[in-house]
Amino acid sequence: CASSYQIHSMTTSTIAALTTHDTTRIDDVRIGAVRPLITPALLEEKLPVPAAAEALVESSRAAISRILQGQDDRLVVVVGPCSIHDHSQAMEYARLLKAQADALSADLLVVMRVYFEKPRTTVGWKGYINDPHLDGSFAMNQGLEMARQLLLDVLDIGLPVATEFLDLLSPQFISDLVTWGAIGARTTESQSHRQLA
């Protein structure tokens, strides 16, 4: 094929010129920095799922399934703040919620709402994963690690968790810890989110 011949016959200097051409005046003009993202496998290796947390996720997913199928008379109640922005406050809330969840367990399956991402129709803080320090630094690797650690800590006290999957990358880092994954109102018409569901 002529086009593959042309590609294969490019000289080293031509290829070097292609890869070093400065397009910063026209490409990604609103991007301040590009940083590598940790892989899900590395984060899971750093913060693995303990057996007790895995068992809780599995049993609470099964319980929700039974409730939705009418095989369990309890109600599923997802309760929690609009979004997470502080680990210690989230854990204080989780401890208080755990006491209520235990007291009401005959009638309710309580799942803590732990939403890390904020859907935005305008500019604004995008959430704990995207900007964990609330300072515009967009330290996403830290945000992903902090989010995963928080989920592990909530599971450790015995509460299942729910979150909204807004960014399609986030589930790869935290879905193994989530009992209930939600697709929000702003993304229900998104084909990629429907495929995720």
Predicted regions and their residues:
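Glycine-rich anion/phosphate-binding loops
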Residues: 84-104, 137-149
